[in-house]
Structures are given as structure tokens and as C-alpha cells.
Amino acid sequence: MKLYLCARHLILALLAYTLLVGTTWANDGFKVDSTPRVAVLSAFEPELTLLLSQTQQAKKHRINGVDFTTGKLQGKPVVLFLSGISMTNAAMNTQLVLDRFNVTHLVFSGIAGGVNPGLNIGDVTVPEQWGQYLEVLMARETEPGKYQPPGWMDDVKLPNFGMMHPRPVGVRSANAPKEEKKFWFTADPAMLATAQRIERLTLDKCEKGDAAKVCLTAQPKLVIGGKGVSGQAFVDNAAFRDYAFKTFEANVLDMETAAFAMVAYSNSVPYIAFRSLSDLAGGGKGENEIGTFFKIAADNSAKVLLAFLTEWR
């Protein structure tokens, strides 16, 4: 009997170990499901609230602490999640969704700081290209106010902001296994064409809700095309805002999209990003406006995304 019990305990222990190893393996690389989906992401929760509230057949999956919601949005199979704020989170979790779900297209929705002086708070931009403005050389000061790149560094082509000289980033992809240097990552032409078909969409001028009192001074508009830039900084500086507009011809500046776009490029997955202006990145007359206009901006971005999915074929 004692021998039988020992053997039984050994078998149970081996079974438990096998299950544990199997679970660990599954968590290391399995696909959650095989349904082709559009991945929809935002940086933090309030940006995703409206979209989650309209998702049908919603089912949650937690991977590496990130909650993914599968379901249908405007009749399209989707997986929605929060990337987290800033570049590393955006890159890491964009790759995670590509690894664990059958993602056919990537869509980012959220807020941004306005850089183009021709745009207003509440406007929604859909840039054609995104670049990383903080991929930089911090050059030595060779004389007062003058910062000189080393002679061997031949990829410093853009104007500098003080000691900061923007540079392209090295990237590999399935189509270019040898590292290439790129500054701009281009949104998918077919997705941009779909966005152009909803360009006359009426956006909200006032915050929704019975207690809402916040309204914009100008009717917001949807702007397709142009450029956006991203980096690991919350920008609230008029001088840098002016530099970003003149140097990159940027409409908006944020903290995630260029990293997301780079991962999309590396994986050869089409992408588009909708960014609504919540503030002017330091260009306003008073304190930064994000606290006042965040909700209008986030809801307008989500409204455009919903219209885009309705139009998407």
C-alpha cells in the first residue's frame, strides 16, 4: 500500500509539472484566437472608454498584465487594449498584440498636443507620416551657443534644437532584414483613403453629459494628411512647439504613435492613427489646456475611429 501511495503521489506530481510546463509554454507564444481582427489601441483608459462601451460580444483576455478585449465594433472584429503611456509601452504592447492575436490592421486613437498653428483644440488629425523627434544626438558645445556633431556622424541632417540633433532610427523588417535608417514611418494608403471619405464628419464642439459645461470656441475639424512626431516627453514649451512645426512640418506631437508606427512597419502590418488636439503643447496664452479639453478631444478621436470602422471595407 505504501508503495502504491508513493507511486500515486509521484504520478500526480509529474502531472502537475506537465501542466505547469504546458501553461508556461502557452503563455510564451500561443495565439489567443485565429479570427482576423483590427487592433485598436489608446494610451490610457479615458481615451478608450467610449470605444469599449460600444464593443459587442466583448470578451477579456489578460496577457502580461495587459487587458485585451475582443469583440465587434461597428460590425468589424476587433481587439482593443491600452498601450500604456510613452514610447516603450507603445512599442512593447503593440508587438504583444501582434504576437498573440491575428491582427490584420493597427489603429491608434487618442489625444495629442497641437503643433501646427493653423489647428485648434478639438481638431482631429490623421497624419500620413510619423517620426521620432527625441531620437537625437546630444552634441557637445564647441563655443557658446553652438553645438557641433562629430565629423563621422553622417546622419544628422535636420536642424537642431540647442544641443539636440534629430537622427533617423535603425529598424529591421521582414521586407528589409538588413538594418535601414528611417525617420518617417508612413500610414497605410488604403486606410488613409478610407479616412478621406469621412473627412466631412461633424465633430463635437461641446463636452457630452448633463453636467458638462466645456465648449470649444471653434468648430473642430478632421484633417487628413501631414505629419506627426512622438517622443518620451510631455511638451508644454512654446519654443519647442515652434521648432517642431518648422523642422518636421508636424501637425501634432504625442508620446506613442511613432513607436507604434515603427513596430507596424517592422511587422509589415498596415496602420493609421487618429489624434485629437487636447492642448497646444505650450502654444496657448495660459496654463496647458489638457485638463480642460481632454474629454472633448478623446471623444472626438473615438468618434472619428468609429466612423472610420463603419466606412472600412
Question: What is each stretch, according to the model?
Answer:
Residues 7-8, 46, 278:
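Residue-level micro-sites within transmembrane alpha helices that shape
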Residues 1-11:
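Bacterial N-terminal signal peptides that target proteins for export
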Residues 24-26:
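Boundary at the C-terminal end of the N-terminal hydrophobic targeting segment
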Residues 36-64:
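N-terminal targeting signals for Sec/Tat export/insertion, comprising classic cleavable signal peptides
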Residues 11-12, 47, 191:
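Alpha-helical structural motif
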Residues 28-38, 62-313:
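Glycine-rich phosphate- or other oxyanion-binding loops that anchor nucleotides, phosphorylated ligands
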Residues 9-22:
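Bacterial N-terminal signal peptides
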